[in-house]
Structure formats: structure tokens, C-alpha cells
Amino acid sequence: MAQLIIEQPGMPPITVSIDENEVCLGRAEDNDVALTAEEVSRHHAKIGRRQGRVLLTDLKSLNGTYVNRQRIVERLLSDKDE
């Protein structure tokens, strides 16, 4: 099963398992994973499965979503992406 490891300054890493359900990320409490960084939008991104692969989608966040230092709108993830 795929896992997402979320690192936030001053906090221990959060490990999220990616199964068949979408996982919503953002500052708002109604997200599956609530993040604390001020640069994170209330509803920032979602991650889920598409055809057996892991897909990360930005939810029109103000500061953007980045994979390997490149801003993305939507991207299929690979092992070791950051």
C-alpha cells in the first residue's frame, strides 16, 4: 500500500496510507489530514488512486502544490517523489 509522509516544521512526520479513498489535505478541520502551516490553504490538495497509481491534485490553493520542487496542478506520483 502506498504511503504519504508529511513533514511540517517543529512537528513529527505524519504517515498517511493511500488506499481506494481520496485523502483531502489542508488547514481546515474538515480535511482528512489537517495541516498547520500558514502557507497551506484551508482545502489545499487531495490525493487518491487512479488506475492503480497515486494521483496528487492541487485544489486551486493560493501557494500551490509542489512535487520535486515543481508546481503542479495534477500529477501521478512515483516512489521517492518529494
Summary of predicted features, one role per range:
Residues 2-8, 12-82:
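Forkhead-associated
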